[in-house]
């Protein structure tokens, strides 16, 4: 299930003033004193994701920005909706926004997807090394296998069952090149420290045919997100026609 927020800034400021950690903290603040209130302290999959804020240009007073939040937990989305529905104004990094529109909705499973935020995968988690498209040793099959292994692991943790999946998670993938690059370096500020997270963006992630028994798995990844750090807003995907 998904939640779309239309946020109207009450002043002008630069786009980089709000980062992924800002949005994650905002979502956790909405969950306070709910059944999901202690989620941030739990060392396990969170099973939710959010998109990049769009359009990706500077904030202008009175001009709407949009944010999508998704989760396979319907109740999680319901809690956020109820909290936000009672608020006329929200703060993100001390910048005030009017909640001009709030919408809950579900999407049908399609066989093609596009990234709404970079997909993050570790090449070596112990060493903190991310898979980078432009590394000399980049291996597309290794990337797809890591993507699949991570998705299956999360699915099993959520449903306590094996997913039905025939073949690879995707049959065709095509990178999205922005400013001449596929790799996206995102600077995250947390507790006064900054660190870089490296992800990749894709204009096409396609499974040629999704069988009826596979739809549950693809609905899950569409709601949960792909790769690592989903609750930090990485790996958000949208279905395309």
UniProtKB/Swiss-Prot annotation:
GO terms for molecular function: endonuclease activity; RNA binding. Belongs to the CRISPR-associated protein Cas6/Cse3/CasE family. Its EC number is 3.1.-.-. CRISPR (clustered regularly interspaced short palindromic repeat) is an adaptive immune system that provides protection against mobile genetic elements (viruses, transposable elements and conjugative plasmids). CRISPR clusters contain sequences complementary to antecedent mobile elements and target invading nucleic acids. CRISPR clusters are transcribed and processed into CRISPR RNA (crRNA). This protein processes pre-crRNA into individual crRNA units. CDD domains: Cas6_I-like. The record marks 46 as: Transition state stabilizer. The keyword rRNA-binding does not apply. It comes from the Archaea. One of its GO terms (biological process) is defense response to virus. This is CRISPR-associated endoribonuclease Cas6 2. The active site is at 28 (proton acceptor), 40 (proton donor). It is an enzyme of class 3 (hydrolase). Keywords: Antiviral defense, Endonuclease, Hydrolase, Nuclease, RNA-binding. It comes from Methanocaldococcus jannaschii (strain ATCC 43067 / DSM 2661 / JAL-1 / JCM 10045 / NBRC 100440) (Methanococcus jannaschii).
């Amino acid at each position: 299930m998904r939640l779309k927020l239309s946020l109207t800034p009450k002043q002008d400021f630069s786009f980089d003033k709000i980062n992924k950690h800002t949005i994650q903290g905002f979502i956790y603040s909405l969950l306070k004193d709910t059944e999901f209130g202690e989620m941030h302290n739990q060392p396990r999959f969170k099973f939710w994701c959010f998109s990049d804020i769009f359009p990706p240009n500077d904030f202008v007073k009175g001009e709407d920005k949009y944010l999508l939040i998704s989760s396979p937990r319907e109740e999680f989305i319901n809690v956020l909706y109820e909290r936000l529905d009672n608020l006329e104004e929200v703060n993100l990094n001390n910048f005030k926004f009017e909640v001009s529109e709030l919408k809950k909705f579900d999407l049908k499973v399609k066989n093609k997807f596009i990234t709404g935020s970079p997909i993050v995968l570790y090449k070596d988690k112990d060493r903190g090394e991310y898979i980078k498209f432009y590394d000399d040793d980049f291996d597309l099959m290794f990337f797809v296998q890591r993507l699949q292994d991570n998705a299956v692991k999360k699915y099993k943790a959520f449903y306590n069952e094996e997913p039905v999946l025939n073949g690879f998670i995707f049959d065709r993938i095509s990178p999205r090149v922005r400013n001449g690059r596929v790799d996206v370096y995102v600077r995250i500020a947390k507790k006064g420290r900054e660190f870089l997270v490296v992800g990749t963006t894709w204009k096409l992630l396609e499974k040629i045919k999704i069988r009826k028994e596979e739809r549950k798995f693809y609905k899950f990844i569409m709601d949960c997100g792909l790769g690592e750090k989903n609750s930090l807003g990485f790996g958000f995907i949208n279905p395309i026609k």
